[in-house]
Amino acid sequence: MNNDIEFFIKKFNVSRETIEKLNIYNDFLLENNKLLNLIGKTTEKHVFSRHFKDSAQIYNLIEDKSEIIDIGSGAGFPGIIINILMVNDKIKGNVVLIDKSPKKCKFLQDLSNKLSLMLKIENIRLEDYKFSKISTVVSRAFKKTVDTIDILFKNNEKIRNIILMKGKTYQQELDDAKKKYTFHVEKFRSITSDESYILKISDIKLTTT
């Protein structure tokens, strides 16, 4: 058995149907990658380990799955993977994928239809999206931490949780964000890269001067 598929079975107790959805996702992603540049060419042979597994690791960090917003979704990471696992677990909740590229949004909608997912695709600038106070925001390979908080805080000061998937500059990004905001942060080492971390940020407030 493929080690990456075994990971999903052991970690998330996924069904055969869910494994089939992941395989469909893999094939459709590769089929569209040349045209849309969804993932780096060097990762095309490692979609499960580099992208699917990486995205799935934040699933259990999302305590409230009633509304999840994936910002800068692009190829659907991590939002599509999260929604696939929610369907596997029969968890109801709203999942929204936001991306400013019309072509990538069409890819996401076509993929959602292929996988029979119930999610919403928003072709909109993040600055123009109105967040609910119950939203949990997730992102992977998006803007710098302080820039992300700037946009989210401006749109809704009551967002509960932000889960950011970051590379080796995560600490510098946190330090920069703390110059402008106070917040609670939990750090989790990535299971796919020793240099990467997941940041779970909450209780955000502007620093008073």
Protein language model annotation of sequence segments:
Residues 159-170:
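Conserved beta-strand signature within the Rossmann-like core of class I S-adenosyl-L-methionine
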Residues 29, 82, 166:
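Residue-level signal for inorganic ion chemistry
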Residues 169-209:
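Active-site capping/gating segments
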Residues 149-161:
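A short glycine-rich, Lys/Arg-flanked "PGG" loop and its adjoining helix->strand segment in the class I
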Residues 140-144:
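Short catalytic micro-motifs in class I SAM-dependent methyltransferases
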Residues 1-64, 69, 103-106, 110-117:
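Class I SAM-dependent transferase core
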Residues 109-110, 149-152, 175-176:
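Short amphipathic alpha-helical segments
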Residues 56-134, 139:
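Conserved SAM/SAH cofactor-binding pocket of Class I
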